[in-house]
Amino acid sequence: MNLTRIAQPGRLRLVIAAVIAAIAGLLISLSQVASARTAEAAAAGDGPKPSIVLVHGAWADTSSWDGVIKRLQADGYTVYAPSNRLRGLPYDSAYLADFLHSISGPIVLVGHSYGGAVITNAATGDPQVKALVYVDAFAPAQGQTLAQLLASSPGSCAVPASLTVVPFPGAPSGVGDAYIKQSVFPSCMANGLPPTKAHVLAVTQLPIATIALTQKSGVPAWKTIPSWAVVGTTDHAIPLALQLAMAYRAHADITRVHAPHLSMISNPGTVTNVILQAVLATS
């Protein structure tokens, strides 16, 4: 009797089973890779990655976005942080609109504080701007001024007694550059930040021309462009109730964060995540 031949069918079955198991394992691995790539593609969106434009507000400068910029660049985004001129709402909005026209492709436009009013006007009618993100920001309606908005919801620390107004050449009569007094800045703008950081920010703040507070806003971009809002719940400059009222009116997706008026400095990760939400929702 040939014992080898008798054993062969059993060995063949073992070989076949091993091959089937190997193929099954390979298919599972390929499926997992495909699923991961599908998830990555979904996260990236179908269209080109938008450029992110960050607009600072009054009593700040472009460095206020440093923590957000680093995170966005690490994710592969092209980021711009143009200097907001702070000369007046029509001028600043026109300047930003021209800057946006220098960028190719889709844009997610982010504004902090007074920068929110600027993006509200600059993006109107611009098809490149796919999303607006307001960070502790003004989102005025047509015909409103920032002074009117602040008067409608008392509690702001940015009152005349907190300001130092300095004349500048060529300014219209009664107009000057307004600074937050250095003694007031930490509690007004930077409450919750380390004292050393708050004092540096007080020294490096950029002033805003007082006329910007009384100039009427134009047709708001948030009427036609999807909007998001980061609302600092301990903001002493723009009262929480006012921020929420403006965000609700703009039908913005709202994220509350325990932060002062400078939430992009105190909570850059949260602000970055909201920007990325806007990117994904509009890609």
Regions found by a protein language model. Name each.
Residues 26-46, 283:
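C-terminal region of N-terminal signal peptides and the immediate post-cleavage residues
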Residues 44-103:
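Active-site catalytic motif of lipid deacylating hydrolases and related acyltransferases
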